[in-house]
Regions:
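Substrate-binding cleft and catalytic face of glycoside hydrolase catalytic domains
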Residues: 139-290, 384-387, 435-439
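Hydrophobic faces of well-ordered beta-strands that scaffold small-molecule active sites
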Residues: 118-124, 147-149, 182-186, 228-232, ...
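Aromatic-rich peripheral "rim/lid" segments of glycoside hydrolase catalytic domains that contact
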Residues: 3-5, 19, 23, 222, ...
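Boundary/entry segment of secreted carbohydrate-active catalytic domains
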Residues: 104-145, 150
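Ser/Thr-rich, Proline-interspersed low-complexity disordered segments
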Residues: 47-67, 74-114
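Hydrophobic single-pass membrane-insertion segments
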Residues: 29-47
Length: 471
């Protein structure tokens, strides 16, 4: 009190008491205001509730992804007799082998998707193709906001529950530094999870589909808040990716999709769940040793069956692929287009929707609409191959000889614009940036699609994508 008296020299007795009383009132009122400001509702303070910071995560593939589908230029090998091997029936306890990214993202979540009307993306191999920081810088220079990284699960979990995350973590950091959004595409279960094998060992789901949900959950837990989309499998209408005793099976795939969707959304509702993109096959083929076993199925038929089984309720976006063969993107399969100089004659001598980028993607959309849904497409792989300037070309990819580098550039850009204008495509990923750098040579089916040549120099499509408008 003595301090107050010294600061109030000259006041009379009554005035002093009044001043003291007034001071006490101000102290009490100020304290109440301070308390309410800290603890009161955010909306009353004119502030937004805290939101998580949106960052980026990625993973990559130790091996390559198919650059084209069998119905578009390659033959699908027949399966042979199966050999049974024991398979663990329990979901393994996850074990972290390397890295600590999960701890850094422990409490964050991805902001709910939906504000972006169209996402421009590209597939990148950020582990096997060199320094991920360099490649993410190239994506940024292209002006693209999304990267696709395929995860061949079998390459990273040799032992149940033990995943080597080191390559994943490096790519996550590189993408985060560039502010890129990431779509994981997960495919190919480890051999220990599957009982069916044959002489032509290929990708397959696990016997216990719960293992897929477990792996998806571990991905989200580790990179929570930095994964923006996950594609659940890849080209599951081919036994190349669904090599099981029963063969291609839409029922089992949709069950896998439901389990994966639940595992992902329960951890991070903001992640875009994409159904596995189908391969445009142009027909159906059965195993010559087992006529009841389908080794590939027409994509329109498979899509219709997925829809009947409720797949649209287990995804945010319907995955789609089309690698454009030697037809321009705006040409329908049945309009009589012909290129008399073409070496690869499939689209001209045997017309079918599967040859046409336009007809295939519009056909998917029409089937979704017919089911009463407005679910968008996510085109997780598209592009045109050109072998111009290469010393060779992949077997079965004669169409890559028909497309010049200038046509590749023109058609890649045109396809992006068409998908943007359609309004029913949410994300589109060009195939691919840098698979030419994996060291597999001109017979690699992925290399003719790449924007980077074998010598590391940009091909014309690189500059065309960089310079195209991206509204």
């Amino acid at each position: 009190m003595s301090g107050f008296a010294r600061r109030s020299r000259g006041l009379g007795g009554n005035q002093l008491y009044v001043a003291i009383a007034a001071w006490l009132v101000l102290v009490i009122v100020g304290g109440l205001c301070t308390w309410y400001g800290w603890l009161g509702p955010a909306s009353d303070r004119g502030e937004e509730s805290p939101k998580s910071v949106e960052t980026v995560a990625e993973a990559d593939v130790a091996g390559g992804e198919p650059g084209g589908s069998e119905g578009q230029g390659g033959g699908e090998p027949a399966a042979t007799d199966a050999v049974g091997t024991p398979v663990p029936s329990m979901v393994p306890d996850p074990t972290v082998v390397q890295g600590s990214a999960a701890e850094e993202a422990e409490s964050s979540t991805t902001e709910p998707p939906g504000q972006e009307t169209f996402g421009y993306g590209i597939a990148v191999n950020g582990v096997g193709g060199g320094d991920p920081a360099y490649w993410m810088g190239q994506v940024e220079s292209l002006g693209l906001g999304w990267v696709k990284q395929q995860i061949r699960w079998a390459h990273f979990e040799d032992t149940p529950g033990e995943v080597d995350w080191s390559g994943f973590d490096a790519v996550v950091g590189a993408a985060s530094d560039r502010g890129l959004k990431v779509m994981f595409s997960v495919v190919d279960a480890p051999e220990w999870s599957r009982s069916y094998t044959d002489q032509n060992v290929e990708g397959a789901p696990p016997d216990n589909l719960g293992l897929v949900a477990d792996f998806m959950g571990r991905l989200v837990d580790r990179y929570k808040g930095r994964i923006h989309a996950i594609e659940v499998w890849n080209e599951q209408n081919l036994d190349r990716e669904w090599d099981t005793a029963e063969g291609v099976d839409a029922e089992r795939y949709v069950e896998m999709l439901r389990l994966a969707h639940q595992a992902i959304k329960s951890r991070d509702p903001g992640i875009i769940v994409i159904s596995g993109a189908l391969s445009p096959t142009g027909g159906q083929q059965t195993d010559p040793n087992n006529p009841d076993r389908i080794i590939w199925m027409d994509d329109f038929d498979y899509m219709a069956r997925m829809i009947e089984l409720g797949a649209l309720d287990a995804c945010d976006c319907v995955g789609a692929h089309h690698n454009g063969i030697n037809l321009p993107p705006n040409v329908a399969w049945d309009e009589g287009y012909n290129d008399p100089t073409a070496q690869f004659r499939g689209p001209f001598d045997n017309p079918h929707h599967s040859w046409s980028f336009l007809s295939t993607l519009q056909g998917y959309h029409e089937r979704i609409q017919a089911a009463g849904s407005d679910k968008p497409l996510c085109v997780t792989e598209f592009g045109w191959a050109s072998a111009e300037g290469f010393d060779g070309y992949p077997p079965g990819f004669e169409f890559a000889l028909d497309n010049t580098l200038e046509e590749q550039a023109q058609w890649d850009v045109q396809a992006f614009g068409m998908m943007r204008d359609w309004g029913f495509v949410r994300l589109a990923f060009l195939w691919n940036l840098n698979y030419s750098q994996l060291g597999w040579g001109p017979e690699d089916p992925n290399a003719p699609y790449a924007l980077i040549g074998f010598n590391g120099a940009a091909r014309p499509a690189f500059e065309a994508i960089r310079d195209m408008p991206k509204p």
